[in-house]
Structures are given as structure tokens and as C-alpha cells.
């Protein structure tokens, strides 16, 4: 049943999976996240639609700025051009009842900030192969955007400028997706006016802190920060004041991840150091080069992306079960007929047959071959085929915390992620 409750005092009724609220061509099914710039809602289309959306609605106070509205729409349209398996797809930018919104694919999962927080709470780390794979896919998505061209083949020179854990989504199907790519440039020009940049300094590059011209290499540095933090479960840059934090970023004095995690190899230390080089000339010159080195390292681990799916479902076991239940209510579908990859335009809801017994893999089975990013010489980057979730999930293996012989060299820092991100789940 669809609720007819109107919005009051500029606020939207968030709705619920079993109590949808109309919003233009969509029905809102509950609030996903709220920030200083926008609110994000789970939504579906008209009755009978078999697809979920994430609808980002601009806060009313920002809509008073005409130039911001214009940029919001222009950058949203740019995001619609970013069709890559490692970037959340944007379907449309629109307006309804004086509210401006962006409709994106819905990804059932958690952002990387939440993953790091849960790892800290459970005294474990993201396994090294998983962290390497996630960083490689982040770099792949960045490279695709960096090399996007217009219809005449002219480079668009896109730079994200806001690559951070909160903008990386990990799905329960093991997908890695960059969020908010197309509107990053618009938001960064206005967020300082409403205090949103506070806390973002720790994911900026040295040249960004200095106010210098930026290119793709600034996103490489930010991706390096994320890699370092996944390997160590520690914030790389922090300070008691904003000025102190900015000085830390400007100097870019980076300890090797192996100082915190003995499972990090010298080769991985070297990759992190090159991505985090203070001077851009010493850094990876493209996100593709970073992705290539990370993918080469993954081959040595014989990592299967399905392991990330298992890790996410185990780490967020209760949340995953709730996701299945809410999705069934949202789409008026039986829970057993659902997969988490429900937002793909070509397929819609994936109906899963009865589970089959798991098939054991031979011990020497090689890892799945990973597509490389589009080359910079192509006029228009082409997205590699997306990773699809298998109908019958493999048995979840219990993730083990780091071995006791790997002591934390800085125990006083262990509570950082939990204390920083104490938010409502």
C-alpha cells in the first residue's frame, strides 16, 4: 500500500519498505543516509517495477543558490556518462515538487568507512588480498573517468577530488563501486560554505592542500591513502587541529603499511609508497598504472572476487539478512527469489533457483581473470563486463583476526575508527 502522506515544512517523509511514500515517479522506501548536502533514500519505480534506486535529494537550503542548482544538474548529467563496473551508475537528474534529485543504482552493502569501523570493533583487518583487490578496482574506476571524452573525442579532464572511504561502496555481492563521482567537482566548490569540508582534509593530496592545479594524480594519492588505511586499519593523516592535519598531508610523511601489518609484503609497501609520493613526478602517473601493479600482485595471491562477497556477508551478517528482508518487502517479492545485484538496468531482479550443493574447487584453480582499465588512447572508455553475483552463494568461511604474533605497534590508536564514526546503523 502506498502512503499519501505529504511533505511538511520542506521535509520528505522517508517511507519504509512496507510503507512507500510517493516522490515524483518514485516511491521512497526509507532513508539510507543524511549529510550536510543531501539525503539519500532507497526507492523503487512505479508499481510492478523490479528495480531499486538510491535517490539523492538536495537539501532545500542549498536549492536557494541558483548556480549550485545549475552545477548540480550539469555534473549529474556528467555522471550519467560514467558507465563502468567500478562506478555507481547514474540514471537521471531531475526535479519534483521543487526538490532536486539524482537517481542512481542501489547497491546493497556498506561503504568502506563502515567496513573499517566494523573491522576495528571486531579487532580484525580487511585481509590483504581483499584490500589489494578493492584498491585496484578503485583505481580502475578512476582511470575510466580520467580518460572520458565527449562525443567529439575531446578529453573531459575529470578529476574526482573527493576519493575517500565514504565514497567507496562494497556490495554484499563483492562489487566495488565509486560513489558521487560526477558531482564531486560541483560539491567541492560549495561545501566549504556549509562546513562539510571539515574532516575531508585527511584524504586530500599535498598539492590539493597547497591550492595548486590538480590532475588525475591527485586522485591516485587519495586512492593510496585508502589502500594504506585498509592495510593498517589506522588513519594515515590526522591532527588535533585542521591546520595540524593539513600540515601532515602537505609533508606526506608516510610509514610503510608493514609497520602495522606483518602480512604486507615489500612489494605492496613499494606500491603504497609510490602512490603516496609527495611530489607528483614521483607518483604513479595514472590510475591505470596503479591498478596494473595491484592486479599483478593479486595474481600472486590467487584471489577470487567471490571471497570479498563472503567477507562482506560474514562481517555484516545481521545487516545482510535485514537487507534481504527489506528488499523483498520493497519489491513485494519473496526473500528467496532475490540477489543483491538488483539494480542492473539490463536485468532487474535476479530470480535465484533453489540452492545447489556447493562444488569444491581444485586446490590449484587459478584466480578469476580481471579485466584491465580502458587505455588512455581510446576516444571513449568502454566499461569492462560487470562482475555478477552467482545465484547460489558459496558457504561463508569464518574470517580470522590477525594472528597473535602480529602485535599492534600503536595500541593507543586502536579505538580511532570506532570513536570517529559513532553513527546510527
Predicted regions and their residues:
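C-terminal lobe helix-coil module of Hanks-type protein kinase domains
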Residues: 166-169, 202-352, 422
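Protein kinase catalytic-loop region centered on the HRD/HxD motif
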Residues: 140-158
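Conserved N-lobe ATP-binding subsite of Hanks-type protein kinase domains
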Residues: 39
